[in-house]
Amino acid sequence: MKPVTTDLCDAHEDRLAEGTLRVMAPVFRAFGKQPAFAGPAATLKVFEDNSLVRATLESPGRGRVLVIDGGGSLRCALVGGNLGLLAEKNGWVGIVVNGCIRDTAELDVCDIGIRALAAHPQKSQKRNVGESEVTVQMPGAVVRPGNWIYVDVDGILVADDKLER
């Protein structure tokens, strides 16, 4: 699916007004080979520790988008080239990170879409700390497990359920 976030916003102004469709703040940079992607959200809440990110990406993605609330940390990366390849191999369509990624050249050849705040060369800690399948606060929007994520070059949308055009 190739989302067109502008068309979805225009077609669902009522949902924007009632809050069942939300727009993330325009603070994310694009990485990965896919400029547009969509799917149901799997969520993680971590801080400078990507142990749970790896464990989640090792599981079947089944067309989902991994939404990682990394607390907006700009001090280390939560996703790198190896995890990008793992996500692609296991059927994840995309990753949205409220934090940093690294190995951008490697990620840019992965056949998934990735959005993150920035690139950072330092890897994260590995303490096995974090929460999965919880409600997370991303820049500008709350994301709950199972919400639908729509991403393209114009932005990131979060819908309570799958949108029809």
UniProtKB/Swiss-Prot annotation:
Record-listed substrate binding positions: G80, G81, N82, L83, R102
Entry-linked Gene3D superfamilies: Ribonuclease E inhibitor RraA/RraA-like (3.50.30.40)
Reaction equation(s) it catalyzes: 4-hydroxy-4-methyl-2-oxoglutarate = 2 pyruvate; oxaloacetate + H(+) = pyruvate + CO2
EC number: 4.1.3.17, 4.1.1.112
GO biological process, one term: regulation of RNA metabolic process
Chain residues that bind a divalent metal cation: D103
Assigned keywords, A-Z: Lyase, Metal-binding
Role played: Catalyzes the aldol cleavage of 4-hydroxy-4-methyl-2-oxoglutarate (HMG) into 2 molecules of pyruvate. Also contains a secondary oxaloacetate (OAA) decarboxylase activity due to the common pyruvate enolate transition state formed following C-C bond cleavage in the retro-aldol and decarboxylation reactions.
Family: Belongs to the class II aldolase/RraA-like family.
Subunit structure: Homotrimer.
Name the record gives this protein: Putative 4-hydroxy-4-methyl-2-oxoglutarate aldolase
Organism listed in the record: Cupriavidus taiwanensis (strain DSM 17343 / BCRC 17206 / CCUG 44338 / CIP 107171 / LMG 19424 / R1) (Ralstonia taiwanensis (strain LMG 19424))
